From Swiss-Prot:
Family (UniProt): Belongs to the TUB family.
Top-level taxon: Eukaryota
Residue ranges with Basic and acidic residues bias: 33-57
Protein known as: Tubby-like protein 4
Amino acid sequence: MAATKREPLRPISSNAGTVERRARGGAAAAAAAKEKEKENEVPTEIGRGKDGGEKKPPVVVAVVVPPAPPLKPSSLQVRMKAEEEKEREEEEEGSSPAVALVAGLQVRMGPRGRELLLPPPPPPPPLPLPTSSSYEAWDLSDNEAAPASSWATLPNRALLCRPLPLDVGRCTCIIAKETLAAAAAGARGVALYSLYTNEGQGRQDRKLAVARHRRRRGRSEFVVAQNLDGIFCTSDKNFLGTLSSNLVGSRYRIWGQGNRVDEIKSQSKRLLGVVAFAPTVTTLTGSFRSMRAWIPKNQSIHLKNSNSAQIQHISGLPKDWQEKKIKADQLCSRSPFYNNMTKRYELDFRERAGRMGYKVQPSVKNFQMTLEEKGRQTILQLGRIGKSKYIMDFRYPLTGYQALCICLASIDSKLCCTL
């Protein structure tokens, strides 16, 4: 019996089985990868295999994924859709929302029971155009004329020599210095002041009077007439009178024309007014002017629409008018107020600020006069609106000539006033 050859024994190790298994697993993975590469290889000859037979192309299987089932709408969406369809049907049928009474008011109810706003009311019909002259002058366009003033029908002589009727109210005039016009008329070097009516927008202003200023022996003198002919010839029918002052300019006297026949016989004139200026009033905050005027009282009151004759002045102020003040009307200047913004004294012209489009400028020559001390109604006022241009408002019992002379006395330069 033959002896069997034995292999030498290997040392037993705990990692021997693990190493062997890893080796076998690696070989199997390599073989599988190699087979996969062979499957993915593109054959160089289509239709021929290794054995020479025809090779079929690979079959491509299209996998169709079924669409996802639609989502089921929620109960809220179903209800909203039903309400929209219901509203659409109501609109097609022409049904209008219901109207309910809530707290005594009509409220339109929608299809869902909601309150709807009522439609706005229709616009009111346009107002008819006014047929009278009661509307204001500033409501007119540039091409329309302002309504005629209540004194527009009075002639020039009546405005100058007769008191303004009570029912006329206030008369507005413009005083302008016209040196160039005087030079053109042959009176070179003589200052002329012209008085114009302010008829309003779109109307022709009337020239009422002209005043010539000159100095005689240091005193101011104004010769007033309706035109230039009366200025240079006092016997002309257009001559109205003169305004003269004392040496320092503290007192002015208004002389009227009077009856020309009586003047030739007695060589006397009628005193139609006196204007007195007090020395400049000086206070801790500044200074301002103060003035007074006296005019004859009228015999009666005249109305524009009455059939009675025009009233006339009495024979002027009597010689003892200062002792008999009852025969004269006294006009007092209104005290100005101190403006903290401009730091000076000013008068309140807001009453006439929007009328006729003129803006009164601050000036020491501006004034407002009333019939009583601290009276409320303004009888005469003067306001500066430009260089050597003033606006004048006067009312009963003044005449246009008296109002012009009082304003010229304030415009004239004087020694008694430091302003």
